[in-house]
């Protein structure tokens, strides 16, 4: 199956790089040599993306790809201190994969003075991507919205604000959650098909837990599969809480945060209330899977007591690859308790329609793309104007 590999290369030399020769092995196959090209010459000190074509010998999951650079601009390259880079890949037949949804897990906190940058980035990319393929989760640490069940993120990424996309640290890595980086990472993640799909057939809420009926389906056969289902409860319109705001009084254009005080009273979205579990639930997916077969899982449940208002909640189900740690695919549905209020009109509830930003400030003239709270009488809803 003809395939392509994308690699990141940093130029530590004094001259530009146009091509690199890559010596690689896949699984137990013999070493092969390929030429990786850049879209434009890589200048000294810069890091760029190159890709090369290769043909795997077999279709299957979790194959080890090992490579090293052996040529630069057609000339032999030897670096005694360089170790081969490795990645675990899955090879599927062309056209046999599934549409890939993108999970962005952002590490944030009200104590973090730069985190307004992530708040703006997440809201803007949500305004761009409205087809359900984006699943944003804001994981708060050391503030009133934090949950110990999501402490795994502390070991996965450093500092705040920061984010990971499908937990893919090979082709994407840890990123800053500004809008431009989030959008690029989303586009990269969406390009490749997923090896599996996951569906939440139904959820049932009671006073302390939410129970799930979930199905999964794979595009490959695997006899020693190591996949697990993870469940997340997320809530919007949380707060207000005081958000530390470095941008207050600066000349940085950050969607109005530069005009807000420090700290700024803020309503938060996409707040992770609980996850079960960060590594995924054991025995939630069989160890032997067959392509095209649907597997049901009805034993999953999650603590929902952290949710303050179920009308603002939604639930996420993810397939975790236990070997690589990556999210192979995910899906999200609103809480059954949520009420669709997006089409509120004055006739439905007496009173004028008014708009507020996430800090609770009135917005007289909304502009296209803004995420706002819309009120009408006693009713309110979160909308993208």
Give the positions of each predicted feature.
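C-terminal tail/sorting-segment detector
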Residues: 373-385
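Asparagine-centered strand-capping/turn motif at beta-strand->loop junctions
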Residues: 8-14, 218-220
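Local sequence-structure signature of Cys/Sec-based thiol-disulfide redox active-site neighborhoods
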Residues: 94-132
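Short, conserved sequence motifs used for protein processing/export or organelle targeting and
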Residues: 34-43, 74, 132-338
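Intrinsically disordered, low-complexity Pro/Gly/Ser/Thr-rich segments with frequent PxxP/GP/PP motifs
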Residues: 30-59
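Residue-level detector of functionally pivotal "anchor" positions at catalytic/ligand-binding pockets or at interdomain
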Residues: 1, 88-102, 332-362
């Amino acid at each position: 199956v003809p395939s392509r590999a994308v690699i990141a290369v940093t130029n530590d030399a004094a001259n530009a790089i146009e091509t690199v020769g890559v010596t690689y092995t896949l699984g137990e196959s013999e070493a092969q040599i390929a030429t990786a090209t850049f879209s434009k010459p890589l200048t000294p000190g810069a890091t760029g993306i190159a890709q090369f074509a290769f043909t795997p010998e077999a279709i299957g999951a979790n194959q080890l790809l090992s490579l090293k650079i052996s040529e630069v601009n057609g000339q032999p390259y030897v670096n005694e201190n360089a170790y081969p880079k490795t990645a675990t890949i899955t090879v599927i037949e062309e056209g046999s994969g599934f549409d890939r949804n993108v999970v962005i897990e952002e590490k944030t906190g009200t104590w973090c003075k730069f985190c307004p940058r992530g708040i703006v980035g997440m809201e803007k990319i949500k305004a761009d991507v409205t087809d359900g393929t984006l699943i944003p989760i804001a994981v708060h640490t050391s503030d009133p919205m934090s949950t110990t069940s999501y402490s795994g993120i502390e070991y996965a990424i450093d500092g705040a604000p920061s984010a990971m996309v499908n937990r893919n640290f090979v082709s994407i890595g840890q990123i800053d959650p500004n809008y431009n980086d989030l959008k690029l990472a989303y586009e990269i993640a969406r390009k490749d098909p997923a090896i599996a799909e996951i569906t939440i057939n139904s959820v049932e809420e009671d006073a302390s837990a939410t129970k799930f009926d979930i199905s999964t389906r794979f595009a490959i056969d695997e006899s020693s599969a190591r996949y697990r289902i993870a469940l997340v409860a997320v809530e919007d319109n949380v707060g207000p809480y005081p958000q530390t705001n470095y941008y207050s009084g600066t000349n940085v254009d950050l969607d109005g945060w530069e005009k807000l005080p420090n700290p700024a009273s803020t309503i938060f979205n996409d707040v992770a209330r609980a996850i079960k579990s960060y590594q995924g639930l054991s025995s939630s997916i069989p160890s032997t899977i067959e392509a095209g077969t649907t597997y049901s899982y009805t034993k999953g449940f999650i603590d929902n007591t952290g949710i303050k208002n179920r009308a603002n909640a939604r639930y996420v189900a993810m397939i975790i690859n236990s070997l690589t740690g990556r999210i192979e695919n995910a899906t999200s549905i609103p809480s059954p308790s949520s009420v669709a209020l997006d089409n509120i009109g004055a006739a439905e509830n007496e009173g004028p329609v008014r708009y507020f930003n996430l800090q609770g400030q009135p917005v007289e003239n909304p502009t296209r793309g803004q995420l706002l709270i819309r009120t009408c009488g006693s009713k309110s809803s979160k909308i993208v104007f």
